[in-house]
Amino acid sequence: MRDRRNNLAKLNTLVFGRDLRITKGEPYPHIYEYDFSSYYPEENYIYNQDLPEGKEIFDIRFYGADVRNDDNALFIQKAVDDAAKVGGCVVVSGGNYVTTTVFLKSDITLFIFRDSSLSSNKTGEGYNHLGIVHCDSCRNVTLTGGGKLIGNGEYFGRKPLYDKNIIEHSEYIDVIEMRKKYRAQLRFAHESKYGGVLYIKNCTDIKADNFIIENSAHWSFHIENCNGVEIKNFVINNNRHVANADGFDISGSSNVSINHCFVSTADDGICIKNALWLGNTNEMKNISVSDCEVISCTNAFKIGTETTFDISDVTVSNCRFFMTDIYPGTVSGIAIESADGASVHHIKVQNISMNRVTCPVFIRLCNRNRASTVDGSSANAVEFGKRKKRASSAAKDRFHQKGSIYAVDISDVTAENIEIPVIIAGYKQNEKSFYVSDVTLKNFNLQYAPYKEVYDKRRFIPEYVDVYPESWRFRNLPAYALWTRHVKGLKLLDFVCGVPRSTWKEEIITEDVI
């Protein structure tokens, strides 16, 4: 164990919550070694594919698209418009085509051959945060072919604090040091950032099969207010240090399946959100994730943090969550959060393997109540490199203390090289406790990374009621297997955690658990 913290280390602890963020400087397009994962199994997910039979073909080259053009949007859009009249297939073949936003329409197939791609420009002009491919109020749209959408993410982030990525683990397990080094490697947004790569909203019956997104500058594949989305054989391969580059973001949508996909990204791998400021208005349900590999610097699978409206009936199964090459590892493998008033319930997770995931499971109910401080414009300000603005109209009481988490069943989890315990926490505010309820953890086998522990024993652990929920928020907890607070109906069945090296911590700590 490390000696007790000296005065400098204590000061570092006090400023732990400060937001290390680079806010000045021009875009920095240089790619560091290990920005992209060395493990990239494209051949396991993507295959050579023939054009669909029975569909009329609309090749973008026939409309004037050329790999030498600075912007092919007009030519691609004309092909889309004509294909939509007959339910045709828009074909991208013969190389990489730079384009500003292309708007898909109902009843078409976008087919990008495996050797071809559509890519963003390197200025960010011409997108209006709509992404490279945008699909609004459409039905019956298919994306396929084995080709790519390329986001050129590094052209829209500032130089990170560090001049190279960290690949060696610290001598100690220390959450404070992890967070500092993680943020020092991030490329925070320049104001030129255009948005994500693929954005579908208000759509029904969408299919994406045999498709690649590469190097997004923001959310890679955003699914907003949709019903009936099927994604399989899909690859997202991003720069792991471009801030806010999520993999899949599902917001306000129901009946969505993500099957047999690979994600390597800087921010959340697969994320479910449902929030007022995202333009969501209804509950969302019936989301399934299966047979996926996820490399994420933050959370491999996450519900949250944006959660004003209810989320239920979510299943995650047969997945592998892990980190390669760089330090620190993934923040959390499974994160289930209600921060802004949503009821999150009937969540089932089973058969998950993890390696180099700092916190295997993080379940957190709190009262951030973000709808009282932001609207759609202000919520995006920081993410797009602009000054944070307060919302013009606040919904202070609408979602205050309304959130809940219950009926969570997680089973058959194997995790190697973890660094902090499973965390389950409700909150206490104004002398009233709000509980996470009815959680079952079954067949867990957790093993610690072989490093020394920092000694960080505190007299009390704050509630952190109204701040951003993250497993790192609680810092170096005094339990190594499980730390719980404000929980009702917790069941542990065959829950095993190996004892970490020379630990000073207790195995399990329960506080206000009934």
Spans of model-derived segments:
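Extracellular "leader-to-stem" segments immediately downstream of a signal peptide or signal-anchor
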Residues: M1-T109, F113-N202, K207-D209, H218, ...
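Extracellular beta-rich repeat passengers
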Residues: T307, I326-I514
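Short glycine/acidic-rich loop motifs that flank beta-strands on beta-rich extracellular proteins
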Residues: T100-T101, N121-T123, H129, N152-F156, ...
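Alpha-helix capping and helix-loop boundary segments enriched in small/acidic/polar residues
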Residues: V67-D70, A245, D249, I258, ...
